[in-house]
């Protein structure tokens, strides 16, 4: 059954069908999106089941069904019942409007609906204008009811290359006490998606702007203010440098573990006593423990950890590679080749880091 036929069947029974969420956003951005989600307005759940007996309900979810390999959700409201991102009471009813359903969504660019039959947009929060301006903005103050939205916003910044507006950053900070309620599995999923983004650095930069980076990424937060020799690093501190390296590596590989290795290759600089700035003697060895700690408390894959450790242990060799004996050069190449990191090193990263003096 085609979507248009489903929409007409719903209309005959007094309802409307809307395309919602990321599919609408990505269509307006000219991006591909094969995950289409629909919102059913104006009919009760029992009516929907009678109209589409082939629809499969998703677990114990409230009014969410799989039909024709697409997701259909009855319009609903969410009421906060406690602390955390799962403490919500969900209500579905035929008198809930599409505008009310959109109100519960996190940011304006995700709160746009498109009528399947007429093509008319429902955009009560100005999401289309924010898409044009490349801005991420919370729909309402209800944004603060779900702490996971902090990481979702940061992830959208990295995948869309959008800027988060000031009031939303302030709301992200206000939710900070509840961030501890988010499971490490959910944080890992958001981090994984962010690392796949066009500019993965924006995930961490956004969290820094909201002053919540330290909550789950304290190892990276310690890089902020870690001064480096200006003759080698005119870009700024170790945090700025790591963000630049991450984005350059992202330009040449889509592998998450390689991007992660770029992110953490200089974590050892966060362990340097301030009185030793701008030098970071032995930071390649000092970086191993922070990488292990970060991977442990976030539950990151072993492959990510091994790649990160290889990156921090070996990234200083490039500066002296041409001075090494051939046998030592071969040993180095073999070590990297046998590691999960492999020889897929970012050429630009090598030029920017390995050809510099290694004394820092």
PLM feature segments, named:
Residues 1-360:
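Catalytic cores of the polymerase beta-like nucleotidyltransferase superfamily
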